[in-house]
Amino acid sequence: MLKLIDMMHIAIFTALMAVLGFMPPLFLSFTPVPITLQTLGVMLAGSILRPKSAFLSQLVFLLLVAFGAPLLPGGRGGFGVFFGPSAGFLIAYPLASWLISLAANRLRKVTVLRLFFTHIVFGIIFIYLLGIPVQAFIMHIDLSQAAFMSLAYVPGDLIKAAVSAFLAIKITQALSLSDTMFTKGG
């Protein structure tokens, strides 16, 4: 059973995802998957929350989207987004956040650099591993073509990984929360 504080953390990070969804998307001419800031929220939730809370914050966000809340960039929402080219990327959010949290909890010493590499592995590579095949399937293109198109996202995602690592450390230090990644367990 979740404690009240866990529910509050889940709500805060669900709201953060919604706020990041109001940032205008950047569409590229060669792919229907927009560049957004929401993976920053996935990485932050995973870096700051316990694994279960990190997962649930992203799941609640996706449920709100599925039920029609226009929380994705460009005001998108509704069940149909889970049948579009972004579906695999979206579905990866809860698992990526959970994996980031698990990995962060296992770090002996949490540093910006270690968290940055954790974000690369689980916040970028893992999300791509789920998102690219689904995108290829939905768009009826080769997997290699979808992977090549996704290379355009890598520089921005690396910046988001670095920013979220830095912010996670600073936020956690500022709040000195006892139930963050710095406390093992959960």
Swiss-Prot record:
**Transmembrane helix is among the record's keywords:** yes
**Where are its TM segments located?**
10-30, 54-74, 80-100, 119-139, 149-169
- Gene3D superfamilies, alphabetically? 1.10.1760.20
Chief localisation class: membrane
Q: Keywords of this protein's UniProt record, alphabetized?
A: Cell membrane, Membrane, Transmembrane, Transmembrane helix, Transport
Extract the Pfam families matched here.
BioY
Q: Classify the protein's membrane topology as the record does.
A: Multi-pass membrane protein
Cellular component terms (Gene Ontology): plasma membrane
What switches on expression, per the entry, is described as: Repressed by presence of biotin, under control of BirA. Probably part of the bioY-yhfST operon.
Locations listed in the record: Cell membrane
Write down the InterPro entries for this protein, in alphabetical order.
Answer: BioY
A GO term for molecular function: biotin transmembrane transporter activity
- Tell me the superkingdom of the source: Bacteria
Sequence similarity: Belongs to the BioY family.
Q: What does this protein do?
A: Probable biotin transporter.
What is this protein's record name?
A: Probable biotin transporter BioY
Q: Source species, please?
A: Bacillus subtilis (strain 168)
